[in-house]
Amino acid sequence: MSCPVPACCALLLVLGLCRARPRNALLLLADDGGFESGAYNNSAIATPHLDALARRSLLFRNAFTSVSSCSPSRASLLTGLPQHQNGMYGLHQDVHHFNSFDKVRSLPLLLSQAGVRTGIIGKKHVGPETVYPFDFAYTEENGSVLQVGRNITRIKLLVRKFLQTQDDRPFFLYVAFHDPHRCGHSQPQYGTFCEKFGNGESGMGRIPDWTPQAYDPLDVLVPYFVPNTPAARADLAAQYTTVGRMDQGVGLVLQELRDAGVLNDTLVIFTSDNGIPFPSGRTNLYWPGTAEPLLVSSPEHPKRWGQVSEAYVSLLDLTPTILDWFSIPYPSYAIFGSKTIHLTGRSLLPALEAEPLWATVFGSQSHHEVTMSYPMRSVQHRHFRLVHNLNFKMPFPIDQDFYVSPTFQDLLNRTTAGQPTGWYKDLRHYYYRARWELYDRSRDPHETQNLATDPRFAQLLEMLRDQLAKWQWETHDPWVCAPDGVLEEKLSPQCQPLHNEL
């Protein structure tokens, strides 16, 4: 028998088995964010609000997205299903038009059915609406993404509106910032990262609650995967400014919950959808494209506040975590035929009590933009990362906003002119990749020495390939037989050879 949360709680309260106040959950999401915060030891940037949240959180050092692309990542974290299973193979908007399958049971859908009030403020970027319904929604679908995703005063007021109209039900609020995403391709008047939007300068408008912070390009910390050039440093400095705006927005959102008297009843999670938009970052399944910040703050689990977890966790774990927080079971259902859907992620709540031994995470990417078909699958087991490039005969595709970025244009110009690039790779090896890439990050943290053909690692390679294939079968991956076979479920074996010399 199903029982809505408030009704069940009323009954259990009489029996002394239910909390007098409902639990709530707040998910804060950065857009193309990385480790630009004091909480993750970046001393060049000021992020006091994220740092304060980290002191009340368990900080995960080995958290990864399962896909390094905006819509697929958001769909995956809101369903607990990898992109190849939920159907969001690429970007949702405009000509790309990817959508999750109609029968997918998303987190907001399951929460709503269980009596939890749901809200979203900011960048949604997933569909269809029937799969991702929210009771309260202010997104790019009914307003300006700049206003609901970057104007932190507007975001603050929308959070207040959500809380003021709150009824007796517990709530799940999803605040999806548009910072620090690039905007030089779409709104160049606001700067490469929209760092000028709302800064009070002529024609830029003014965000009342934002105190802009400017950074000297000479002072930024250049990650190993970003060219150490003036163009890239200027890009990073602009990115820092928008990270600062988001950080102040995080502080405003948390203050609204505090003022409403619900912060101490609310599970707060902060993370990002994918890696930063720089070479080897977003759209890649390397470490820079998949490693994410992850802060989990539970008012009921202060034991590990301020601690660091080394456990390997995935954004696929967020749906089971939030369902666990609300004590809502995951249903048994099928999307196609009789294949029952099972979550491969796990609840992170046990990690808030004691350090777990979790050591494996998986990745799956098929598209970004509709023209960027470059399916990749990956598994990371402790410090070993295996990447399978299914279209390895083709050059790796570059997305539009990254292509026109100052960093990449400078890299192209330096490469064609034969000048030093200040980069740890070269474009030829970036474009053309081996089918299998195996890296030992304990000895090769920059992932430059491919061990896949080294006979000393043959047994490890086989083990990781088996792990990856097992996960692909469990998650009903249509690409499981590619590139040298075709999936035919009515035959045995189901992977039939193509004899294509691969």
UniProtKB/Swiss-Prot annotation:
InterPro entries: Alkaline_phosphatase_core_sf, SGSH_C, Sulfatase_CS, Sulfatase_N
Effect caused by changing residue 477 to N: In MPS3A; uncertain significance
SUPFAM superfamilies: Alkaline phosphatase-like
Disulfide topology: 183-194, 481-495
EC number: 3.10.1.1
A Gene Ontology BP annotation from the UniProt entry: heparan sulfate proteoglycan catabolic process
Protein's name according to its UniProt entry: N-sulphoglucosamine sulphohydrolase
Outcome reported for the amino acid change (mutating residue 227 to R): In MPS3A; severe
Positions of post-translational 3-oxoalanine (Cys) modification: 70
Residues binding Ca(2+), per UniProt: 31-32, 70, 273-274
Function, in words: Catalyzes a step in lysosomal heparan sulfate degradation.
Cofactor(s) this protein cannot do without: Ca(2+)
Entry's cofactor comment: Binds 1 Ca(2+) ion per subunit.
Effect recorded for residue 40 to N: In MPS3A; intermediate
Gene3D superfamilies per the UniProt record, alphabetical: Alkaline Phosphatase, subunit A
GO molecular function annotations of the record: metal ion binding; N-sulfoglucosamine sulfohydrolase activity; sulfuric ester hydrolase activity
Disease field: Mucopolysaccharidosis 3A: A severe form of mucopolysaccharidosis type 3, an autosomal recessive lysosomal storage disease due to impaired degradation of heparan sulfate. MPS3 is characterized by severe central nervous system degeneration, but only mild somatic disease. Onset of clinical features usually occurs between 2 and 6 years; severe neurologic degeneration occurs in most patients between 6 and 10 years of age, and death occurs typically during the second or third decade of life. MPS3A is characterized by earlier onset, rapid progression of symptoms and shorter survival.
UniProt source species: Homo sapiens (Human)
Keywords: Calcium, Disease variant, Disulfide bond, Glycoprotein, Hydrolase, Lysosome, Metal-binding, Mucopolysaccharidosis, Signal
Enzyme superclass (EC): hydrolase
Effect on the protein of changing residue 66 to W: In MPS3A; intermediate/severe; common mutation in Italy
Glycan-linked positions: 41, 142, 151, 264, 413
Result of changing residue 74 to C: In MPS3A; intermediate/severe; the mutant is enzymatically inactive; rapid degradation rather than decrease in synthesis is responsible for the low steady state level of the mutant protein in cells; the majority of newly synthesized protein probably occurs in the endoplasmic reticulum
